[in-house]
From Swiss-Prot:
GO terms for molecular function: ATP binding; tetraacyldisaccharide 4'-kinase activity. GO terms for cellular component: plasma membrane. Keywords: ATP-binding, Kinase, Lipid A biosynthesis, Lipid biosynthesis, Lipid metabolism, Nucleotide-binding, Transferase. ATP binds at R62, V63, G64, G65, T66, G67, K68, T69. The keyword Kinase applies. Belongs to the LpxK family. Transfers the gamma-phosphate of ATP to the 4'-position of a tetraacyldisaccharide 1-phosphate intermediate (termed DS-1-P) to form tetraacyldisaccharide 1,4'-bis-phosphate (lipid IVA). This is Tetraacyldisaccharide 4'-kinase. NCBIfam families: lpxK. InterPro entries: LpxK, P-loop_NTPase.
């Protein structure tokens, strides 16, 4: 059951009503399948071989984007500052080659996003190819290839993969040194139903080592306080993102501030386009910075053509960096790319460090 069944997240995912209740029996069946898979995994009949280095899994239980990619970038950069040599693996969502792919592919900043996916190329570009990045649906194979070509890597960050049973892990909460991070945005768990009646891949109470909050927090969410350090009995950390200085798509050296854009163009001459799992967050962030105008949300991983932008008839078109990797061949001077950065708190970095420094638990088991 896939999010791709819906072009966009349906409204009934946010609040329980007739449609979600009508679909609930399918969600119940989906839940049974999840439970059966977990039982098989727990019995050990199918046991993947663990990686020789710690794994940090950055995922979500809600389908669609919750802001994982900026977190992966921030994690890799912060871990490097702490003296680690991180590598990154991903399934390669959005890449047309993933289904026909027979072996892992290494991703560089000049890789074709239609083959390896939008996010991996974005990560490579933002980090200037500092970290080895490999993509393949079977993440265990990606790990083997990554370590084969980059034996100095001593920690691996998995962009998504919480639900990937083939990715062996010994979670920190159970005494291991692998870390499962659940990213949660302002939408929370919606109506808290599993697919397709709700937006959840797994139950809302799924175990995790920590929860990372992104975006604004709803004032009526009694489970979260501004000073809370725990969520569902585990550590929780709030991450704040900032929009950077937009740069021209066909001339990245040409930049201007969001304030300059707001002062230079009338709102009816500005169009913002986003193909994200949660585009409204991008639109809201721009509005906070004084950027009003028309907004267009497209399905996650949508592709673009020059004709699409021409038909917008806008003097200024704003897009995300994720969308920009798919627009390399488009030479429209009206398009400006808005970068987004995210910094990890010292508390989060220290907590990660304390777990990653644990001895390999597999060395002490029979």
């Amino acid at each position: 059951m896939s999010f791709s069944f819906f072009r966009k997240a349906p409204k009934f995912w946010e609040r329980r009503g007739p449609t979600s209740l009508l679909l609930w029996p399918l969600s119940w069946i989906y839940g049974l399948v999840l439970h059966a898979r977990k039982l098989i995994q727990d019995t050990g009949f199918v046991k993947p071989k663990p990686a020789p280095v710690p794994i940090i899994i950055v995922g979500n239980i809600r389908v669609g984007g919750t802001g994982k990619t900026p977190i992966v970038i921030a994690l890799a950069e912060r871990l490097q500052q702490l003296g680690w040599n991180p590598g990154i693996i991903s399934r390669g969502y959005g890449g047309k080659g993933s289904s026909a792919q027979t072996s892992p592919l290494q991703v560089k900043s000049n890789s074709d996003p239609t083959l390896v996916g939008d996010e991996p190329v974005l990560i490579a570009r933002r980090t200037h190819d500092q970290f080895p990045i490999w993509v393949f649906p079977k993440r265990q194979q990606s790990i083997r290839e990554l370590l084969k070509h980059s034996p100095n890597v001593n920690v691996i960050i998995s962009d998504d993969g919480l639900q990937h049973s083939g990715l062996a892990r010994w979670p920190a909460r159970e005494g291991g040194r692998d870390i499962e991070l659940v990213v949660r945005d302002e939408r929370g768990e919606g109506n808290r139903f599993l697919l397709p009646a709700g937006p959840l891949r797994e139950p809302a109470t799924r175990e995790r080592d920590a929860t990372l909050f992104t975006g604004k927090i709803k004032s009526d969410d009694h489970q979260i306080g501004l000073q809370d350090e725990y969520f569902l009995g585990r550590r929780a950390f709030s991450l704040l993102s900032n929009l950077g200085k937009p740069y021209q798509l066909n001339n990245p050296a040409n930049t201007q501030t969001l304030t300059q854009i707001a002062d230079s163009y009338l709102p009816n001459k500005i169009t913002t386009v986003a193909a994200l799992g949660n585009p409204q967050r991008f639109f809201d962030d721009l509005l906070k910075n004084g950027i009003a105008g028309k907004t267009i949300s497209l399905p996650d991983h949508a592709t673009y053509t020059p004709e699409f932008f021409t038909k917008l008839n806008a003097q200024c078109i704003l897009i995300t960096e994720k969308d920009a990797v798919k627009c390399s061949a488009i030479m429209d001077e009206c398009i400006w790319v808005v970068p987004m950065s995210l910094a990890l708190s010292d508390n989060l970095a220290e907590w990660l460090q304390s777990i990653l420094q644990r001895p390999d638990p597999y060395r002490y088991t029979l």
